[in-house]
């Protein structure tokens, strides 16, 4: 026997995520993938320019000096930092580190990750600029 009753379908607007700050921040965090795609394409373009010689590389450097590209790269940097911050805050929730029979709080783990990030950044900059 089948029923003729229609199931209730709750209406969902396309702006459902704008109602709560948690959802807005979630959408912002997920949106950091778009600048990551831009940077990936730019990096691949740069590698091909490097492969094709000095003239092609100089064209790529000129492309990077375009003010629009500089602004896009600054937006990409901000998005990468936001993404990094959120992942560093999630890491302690996924790792149970026990020291002297007590669970370690999230602060030392988050600070440690930022220290590692800063050290690696300084090493890469030193190698790139002075090696």
UniProtKB/Swiss-Prot annotation:
One protein family per Pfam: Fumarate_red_C
Any one GO cellular component localisation term in the record: plasma membrane
Record-annotated membrane-spanning stretches: 30-50, 57-77, 109-129
Membrane topology: Multi-pass membrane protein
Compartments (UniProt record): Cell inner membrane
Top-level division of the source organism's lineage: Bacteria
Record's subunit section: Part of an enzyme complex containing four subunits: a flavoprotein (FrdA), an iron-sulfur protein (FrdB), and two hydrophobic anchor proteins (FrdC and FrdD).
Protein name: Fumarate reductase subunit C
Organism encoding this protein: Salmonella heidelberg (strain SL476)
